[in-house]
């Protein structure tokens, strides 16, 4: 299987990527006699040492604010402390963070995952296992990370990294380095199958990510004309956030622009899962789009319990904001059948396409085919549940067998109509640069997700 380049932008996105790569690490062979039955080259880069051993590192470009990397130093595992002190002027800009016990143990070749808890995993680097190349770690120097809040400007603390336009402006300071780092990563690939981006939609990261994506398409993918490559974007929505008007504008801007600039867009009410691993990106994309390239928003995403595998199963009903972070043992309130990460309410949905990724379970496949009254796509992945057994993955499930659902339905139209009304009633401001162009793009998407005649659209056009 060919390679995927992952771009992860923001602390929350980096938490999800850390779980993705910890899952990859669990499949690495640590002895010459180990059986390798997993394609580690999809998400990991390799380099050989003189003694014949192989180093694996994430094929990833991570972006975070100052102090967002916690205790991890950019060159920590590539240069000795003496070399750094001898060659560079070291400027201390804040209190140095100490590693937690888990990371100290990893440095000594030991695993102490039992020491991890909600208090010592505030940063994704607190439980990350793999060593990143220095070129993978990119920092926005003008902004400082603040847990549970938007980042703040280091010169003007009252300014927050909170709106689409701020991210858009900030990107241009890093455009040359971003393109060069991506080029270096791309040159290490033999046959790239696509690019996977994870970012936030409610903050300035949406604008930053969109500008980066536009540049990548223009520089490397013939401005999107070349359909050979898959560009997937996973957009994280903070469902706990009661957005102020500017944050709502930013969310709308991010959803519309990123959907127009990607080949498949997954807006999620919080988590990005790695259940797709092992299935070729182009296959899933073709089946979900079904020839409608502009209908590329996957607005319903669910993780279901596999009843075929267990009769005693429950999903923990928790605050989904904790899914990307490690959590303490959680008390079970009830046992819902699924975790719903969808952007849209799935009630009364009429589906354009629906895909399932399941374990190698023929009875489950037959059950799903009987349940649906229209053609569906079922992909089997024997590794879908591996991440649930990873020692750094949060303990959110009672059982260890799930499958995932990705759907495109007409219910997205209702969300889009709400967004259009919000923008229509807005005044021109710095967050919305071109109000009428944005309304036009939203209207275009509404048409794609409309089945049959819609009287409300006729009323809108007459206004």
From Swiss-Prot:
SUPFAM superfamilies: Tubulin nucleotide-binding domain-like. Disulfide bonds: none annotated. GO terms for cellular component: mitochondrion. GO terms for biological process: mitochondrion organization. The keyword Mitochondrion applies. It is found in: Mitochondrion. Pfam families: Misat_Tub_SegII, Tubulin_3. Keywords: Mitochondrion. InterPro entries: DML1/Misato (IPR049942), DML1/Misato_tubulin (IPR029209), Misato_II_tubulin-like (IPR019605), Tubulin/FtsZ_GTPase_sf (IPR036525). The keyword Mitochondrion applies. Belongs to the misato family. Involved in the partitioning of the mitochondrial organelle and mitochondrial DNA (mtDNA) inheritance. This is Protein DML1.
